[in-house]
Swiss-Prot record:
The gene is fabA. The active site is at H70. It comes from Pseudomonas putida (strain ATCC 47054 / DSM 6125 / CFBP 8728 / NCIMB 11950 / KT2440). GO terms for biological process: unsaturated fatty acid biosynthetic process. Pathway: Lipid metabolism; fatty acid biosynthesis. This is 3-hydroxydecanoyl-[acyl-carrier-protein] dehydratase. GO terms for cellular component: cytoplasm. It is found in: Cytoplasm. Homodimer.
Amino acid sequence: MTKQHAFTREDLLRCSRGELFGPGNAQLPAPNMLMVDRITHISEEGGKYGKGELVAELDINPDLWFFACHFEGDPVMPGCLGLDAMWQLVGFFLGWQGLPGRGRALGSGEVKFFGQVLPEAKKVTYNIHIKRVLKGKLNMAIADGSVSVDGREIYTAEGLRVGVFTSTDNF
């Protein structure tokens, strides 16, 4: 069977309901916290490190929930949502690889913000470069990522870490 290498909004919503990778396995958050509209490319090869890559997009419009509250009179997408989107995508990669368990963000190295997403923007693009996938007692991916708005890079994150756990009782 050939793996799917692109995912629509409906595919991602199925993932948020636990229908894409099976019950108890990697899920994306439901809207409003789902920060991705589509994955345009996912591969277990390629990227900066030759270990895999993802490219995903979020359509921006002035009616998105966060613009109304962050900040009143100065609307901007919270940077932490872009960071969370990158964690979401690293977790998705683990589920797509067939690794069992529920995803949890485990941290990151250096994160830099040097731009912003405003209501007049059209599209955010996420680029994830898988550095390493650990398989065993702990299934985890480590990746670097970036966020661009309308083609201009505005955030970077190094060492994004996400694990999948078959039990989160002692997490």
